[in-house]
């Protein structure tokens, strides 16, 4: 077995344990899956924290608007007047969202605590601090963490979230990943592993590059379209 220290950056890093006789293609597929799951947990955690604090999202056309700003349907094109918006319903645990993206109708403190604790556990599994603690990351553990978040959301919102809520869209694999987040997502066909300034060829065995001992090897995970000189690796 060899312990791979996989890096995209100093903050985007994790340990992966695998037999030295594994094909590079198999390793790369697992590493990319772990990388993408870590990114997903980061996005999901941020949205669930917002859900716990400020409740479900507003309908898309109202996101970013306060409760008094007129909507398009409030304007009368015939006489140019504007109707006053009816005040929205406010729950017992109303907490306004400064970004005006969520309704402010937060869950009870007890349910919010369930959401927050589950997210904290998932973030800990995906954290770069796992490297410092010498804990290898597995695809199953991260997938289970996402499943736990799904369960916590179902407990807090048994009737389900709106179709347009970001939490639901992430859990249902329907999110539009773009911008900086999109750049961090990797496709297996466009990913590559580098070690000792060499790109690992997929058809070869991992042992041809790192040997068969159990020392840690630093692997750099890159998008193939990016031309970047890789740093030399270090043995622990």
PLM feature segments, named:
Residues 1-236:
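Ubiquitin system architectures
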